[in-house]
Amino acid sequence: MTEEKKFSGSNRPARKQAVPERKELPASQRRHAAKLADGTTPAQGGSRPSRPARPNNNNQNRPNNGGQSQNRNNQNRSNTSTGGQNRSNNGGNRNNRPGSRVAPAEGRPMIREKKNWSTKPREGQVDYSAKPDNSLKQYVNENEKKRQASAAAKHPKKPAAATKPAVKKETSATKPATASTTTGAGKFGGALASGNNSARNNSRKRNTNGTGQQTPRRNDRPRGSKKSRRIAAKHQPSTPATVRKEQPLPAVLEYRVGMNVQDLSKLLHRDTAEIIKKLFLLGIVTNQNQSLDEDTIEILAADYGIEAQAKEEEDVADIDRFFDDENIDESKLVSRPPVVTIMGHVDHGKTTLLDYLRNSHVTEGEAGGITQHIGAYQTRINDKLITFLDTPGHAAFTEMRARGANVTDLTILVVAADDGVMPQTIEAINHAKAAGTPIIVAVNKIDKPGANPDDVMNQLMAYDLVPEEYGGDTIFVKISAKFGQNVDELLEMILLQAEVLELKANPNMPARGSVIEARLDKGRGPVSTVLVQQGTMHVGDPIVVGNTYGRVRTMTNERGVELSEALPATPIQITGLNGVPQAGDRFIVMADEKTARAAGEERAKRAQEAVRNSGSVVTLDTLFNTMAEKAMKTVPVIVKADVQGSVEALSGSLKKIEVDGVRVDIIHTAVGAINESDVTLAEASGAIIIGFNVRPTPLAKSQSDSEKVDIRFYNVIYNAIDDVEAAMKGQLEPVYEEKVIGKVEVKELFKFSKVGTIAGAMVEEGKITKDSKVRVIRDNVVVFDGEVGSLQRGKDAVNEVKMGFEFGFTVAKFNDVHAGDVVEAYVMEEVKPK
């Protein structure tokens, strides 16, 4: 039996010293050790007594030749040598660690021990193996008490959880040392070589991190790195995915011929991919946008086990059917603001009245002080909205006034007290009566000297407008729009009349209404002023307007404020159309953009066919045939303007002009700048281009100069009408035709102080005469058109120079002839009627 070590100050058994493996010394070290054993080393010099040799653990069970025959077995015992140093492995002596260089004692060589793995804990790690057996339990209990105290402080009402008594289990550290644990066995010997490895197991106890619960072992932890586990947890759904419930198939598939897979998927409540796959299995290859015929749709329905029934084809281009009163649900009608149209003669104060109502200044910005196109405005009076339509009073705007009367609920007839009833006043009365709208007469300018409102009332009685004070039913209000006199009374009458009419609309339906004005804006494209009559319009609605279509991109009111929706009786400006509609066209919001596109394209196609069939369209062939027939004298004119209302007004006025059988033929009208196509058409037909508030593009201007196309610009319609009428009167006079008689090229210039510059030239074609007119052309551009000043050959003045001769000449009132200029000589000959 080996000797057991006593416990020193603790219940922990002393750690056994690791005995290194025996190692054979080299020959030189063996000889040196033998000399040390004999005590005859040179270092001693015989003066110092020999020190006992240090025990060599490598030499197990071998006697020391130095005279000390102690038995050096492998038992682990503490060193009690002088100096009080604890040389056992339990101490902290650095030189006693395995693998360190041990300072040799006298009589022993320096030997590097074989490296042994240390079981000491790392820095900052708790070494539970150095504590008593119950230290771990005590440490855990202390942490449990701290946790309970912290929980009680946070939740005072909740009693702390009772601590379960720790069950004492016998571990390898508390077992008494046995022979197997005390004897040196194995490679390392001592406790490290024992089967239980109690010291090693105690040093590897898992940390509790202060929670009283041990961290899981490596085999118990989830596999994968922290990053991979975090990514997996992120993509793992927290809740199981819900399976979408498939809607049942319809009992009967009502289809239209030409529907595609995408349309059928909405009717069948199935995905397009499923339908395409089913058709492919049936031997039909298609995609979701390809139209299907009747047989294919019926085969698909039969495969699904349902019946198929073709619906009657609807005329998508017929949008007028939506404006029937039968399509309006009366149970959903609500009150709406009245739409009031202001009519009257020129300068009777219509715009001034509206300007006073909405506190703006439109009159100052209008050309000539006359309203050129319809303006739609909405104002609030006594917490009630009133929509006003301002129609110009000139006779040229008859059609615009008629459109205003068709969309209006009330008509305000403005008559000047100092001017009385005028032709346009009578025209306004007729339009209002034709539309069936009530008329309220506003006798304006009562503040002017010489105003006679009673005379105006008497004049209007001849047109069935009898005042209430005379026993009639027409409301008369005497006002002064300039100073606002009695304007409030006029507004009260408007609201009173609106209550009598019981104006209602359904805001919960697709919007529909009429176009008040349309124009082409350079930055925003087609801009249309529309009046919503039924429903509510939203931004993004697919819309059909006249013969065009689009999607509402923006909506703004009269002040330029963007709106998200527009209720009934609201005038707005919209953008997003593909073309410029006609003023007075109807619009309607469709279910989707595809339907709107189909309806707009079909309406445009039908409109072109109607014009072609009527024979009124003007092409190059029909134009030349008409001119050749000489049925009547015509003046071809092309009209371009900034807005559609001005185009129609100017065209209508020009068509009414007729002087002794000569009339104006409007061959083309459009909105926007004058372009190259207009110039080409004018050059081919010999037409005059009239631009109203527009200018030509640079290319069109260059083309018109080279092709001698006459372009006239106006900003007041009066001037355009007067000029055309004067030209038509000149047309009735004898007709002269230009005839080019010669062509001359300038070769050289001669300058004289008294005469000026004389051009030396040669006649290339024809001849030039003293009485002929000349046209100076430079780089295909006419720089001057005038008469011949002088004509000489040598020093003699001549009246004529023929082809092939050189001569000198001057141009009257023009002294800027250059070498290389081409001069055309022509005369004006009267054309005799046939």
Swiss-Prot record:
Q: Which GO terms describe its cellular component?
A: cytosol
Q: What InterPro entries does the record tag this protein with?
A: EF-G-like_DII, IF2_II, IF2_N, P-loop_NTPase, Small_GTP-bd, T_Tr_GTP-bd_dom, TF_IF2_bacterial-like, TIF_IF2
Q: Where in the cell is it found?
A: Cytoplasm
Residues at which GTP binds: 344-351, 390-394, 444-447
Q: Where is this region: G2?
A: 369-373
The region called G4 is annotated at 444-447
One Pfam family name is EF-G_D2
Task: Spell out the residue ranges making up region: G5.
Answer: 480-482
Q: Any idea which GO molecular function terms this record carries?
A: GTP binding; GTPase activity; translation initiation factor activity
Region annotation (G3) ranges: 390-393
User: Where is the stretch described as Disordered?
Assistant: 1-247
Q: Where is this region: G1?
A: 344-351
Q: Which HAMAP family does this chain map to?
A: IF_2_B
In terms of PANTHER family, this protein maps to: TR-TYPE G DOMAIN-CONTAINING PROTEIN, TRANSLATION INITIATION FACTOR IF-2-RELATED
Listed name of the protein: Translation initiation factor IF-2
Organism of provenance: Leuconostoc mesenteroides subsp. mesenteroides (strain ATCC 8293 / DSM 20343 / BCRC 11652 / CCM 1803 / JCM 6124 / NCDO 523 / NBRC 100496 / NCIMB 8023 / NCTC 12954 / NRRL B-1118 / 37Y)
Q: What is the lineage of its organism?
A: Bacteria, Bacillati, Bacillota, Bacilli, Lactobacillales
Q: State the encoding gene.
A: infB
